[in-house]
């Protein structure tokens, strides 16, 4: 995390509670020029998925070259494999449009199905790779693009790479394989012995190994062919047959797969003992997953997602993904998640594998979780004058990163430079909006936002209630005005809700913003702490933001009534240690502006003397970044 982040969001929003004194209907396309030139693309696209078993009706994959013109148009030339055409690769070409915002958020018209859109992000230069997924339609997919230059030679591939893969053999969800291996290339067409670790759904989903010797690679026409031995029965081995691979211009990334198959392979240049501290800042992510829930009855659970994570340089990260489950609409998930500890990391379900430079990582599922996630480091930004960091419009409670949408009534923190001439906090309610605070105003889709705190590097504000889907707005554009000087504009997605639980800094400040114990009170208004834990059967008060519209409505920045309670319009669920809690109240905290409160009963049977996840779920959001002392 960049050093300008500070733990003031909770103190300025909850001051006193704990004794602490125009429509934006089009995505920002201002950075289209950042996506320009020749890219190698691998995409696996699954459609016609059965809503009960997740059986795949049609599988398609493409591999080849996509050329972006820097002005919002692309062409693709390569090969497509389609189960509707016998699963034999055929020449394929397509064209379409794309947009890239100032923060790297991208939307690309699908080259496989022009009615679908790939959502994702463009990474930092060196290389500016793209990761994306079509989460808003009925299909599930993963899209990876890396910049490629002149024709690759055998000498271009030298050194050690992690490679991760996911393979829907014959386009069948019940025959999915995944795994990872290390490649050591000599620059002359030879690999050292390879050990593949992975699992096969059709072989019992038990983690297994495959040893390969004498594997070679050859370069021709810009493509590197990895000559894995072809097994007589490919369904019984993790890896089989030749793979067509591309290498990025900086030689650090690989992407490809089988032209006649439905696999995706991503490789990252690596080394032993990669420092955890290298993993800082924002990473754009995309993934495709199939969880085997009952193979004997044909049940699979396929989902795809795009998102981002904010790596804290301490081995942990705040993670958001826009996840499209089979049989349901996409929703937004935020969690805190451990990433790396000096190299690869296994959390019991996923194996995470880092690149040597911190520019990328891959994550592979194990056993019955068949998954491939790719993370690409986003660009770091700086500016002069009044400047919003394009990656730093964050939920003020969870610090969920830039792909997380904003919701009406949500407390948001904006980070940057020159945002204010001095530090100021609102002293009364309603919070100032058009009148400004310390000479500062903030516009959200042209509306003045109520301000609770301003400083040269951070502003805390309330998103006006008319913002988002309730106002037929898919995007929200933020702009700061400091003493009549306007900042750059930054555009993000919106949703009905974007829950974020406020957390407390404790243990001498060891918890970074967005991670730690939840801000929860007992009935006597004392804090829930390790020495004063929650108990089964008691009613607790949880404080959060991003729960959206309320009834009766409250004016922007005004205090919620202390006599007529404003309850949230969305259905809310609270999960404590895996058990659903009964909710007595969910709405605005009486007497406060923009602060939401949930009163819930701690379920019986929770583990004592520990910490458990406290999860808040809405119809379109899922927040699991905070924990509860029990």
Where are the regions that the model predicts?
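A sequence-level detector for low-complexity, Ser/Thr- and acidic-rich stretches
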Residues: 47-54, 170-174, 178, 286, ...
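Short linear Ser/Thr-Pro motifs
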Residues: 6, 123-124, 248, 355, ...
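N-terminal start and proteolytic maturation junction detector
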Residues: 11-14, 360
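Bacterial N-terminal signal peptides that target proteins for export
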Residues: 1-12
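C-terminal segment of classical bacterial N-terminal signal peptides
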Residues: 15-24
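Mature soluble binding/inhibitory domains
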Residues: 23-387
